[in-house]
Structure formats: C-alpha cells, structure tokens
C-alpha cells in the first residue's frame, strides 16, 4: 500500500521494503510465540494442580498470558498492537531512507495501520465464512474432532487462497 500511496515517495525497491517489513512482523510474532511457550511451560509445571481444581486450561492460559505480556513486550489488544507495528515500520523505513514524505507521520502511519488491519480482517472473515459453511453441512461436525479439523483446515485454506492471502 505504501508503494501505491500518493503521499509517500519510495526510495528503494519494493522487494527490499517488503523484506524489512517482514522482519519487523516476524520479530513481533516471535515475541508472542516466546510468550506462549513460557505460559505453556508454566501451566505444564502446574498440570496436577490444574487437574485437581478442575480448572479450565484455556482460561488459565489467557490469564497468565495477560499477566506476562508486558514482560515479553507483547501488546495483546489488536488495535494497539497494529498501531505499534505501524510505528515501528514507519520509523525503520524513514530512518533507513526507504521512504520519504512531506505530510505528517500520522498520515503515513495510518496507511500502514489500515493495510495491516485489512490484511488481518481477511483472515477473520475467512474464519467466519468457514464456520458458516460448516454449520450448513448435513452431517453435524463436532469442534475438536479429527473430521472437524480436517474439513475446517481444508475450507480455511480455500478461503485464504480465494482472498489472495496465501
């Protein structure tokens, strides 16, 4: 979106910009992956206690993740997270002379934010469409079963391909 945007002058090749943006996104994903691994580790250590109290592991996972998120530098609120990533991308591209602009930083950041938001909404919409399709199946599929997972993943991949996301 930055390449086609009228308010931004591109000073390096599109593929090099994409590569740098991918690094920023991967770093953010890696931080959350590390957080998830730590939370899983903590819950694994407490497995007997969790079973004894008949606690919901998913709920404990999210509670623990929320508590540790700041320590790992992970922002859990999507809007705040996308805004932070957009700032990181903008700062990097400007500092390394990938782009130039004469408008406000916020205008360019908003282009980046909207692009991230639209991209992520494509995945959410694909997920919703898959759930709707599965609901219409004559044979009722139970979430969590092998049949459900196979059909869900096949339909989800088809939706992502249809939207050009993979």
What do these predicted regions represent?
Residues 7-11, 98-102, 142:
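Charged, low-complexity interaction regions
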Residues 37, 41, 45, 62, ...:
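Short, residue-level hotspots on alpha-helical faces of the histone-fold
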Residues 1-58, 62:
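N-terminal interaction modules that seed assembly of large macromolecular complexes
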Residues 1, 20, 24, 42-46, ...:
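A general alpha-helix detector
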Residues 124-166:
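Alpha-helical oligomerization segments
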Residues 23-31, 52, 56-117, 123, ...:
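Conserved mixed alpha/beta catalytic, RNA-binding, or beta-rich assembly cores of soluble enzyme
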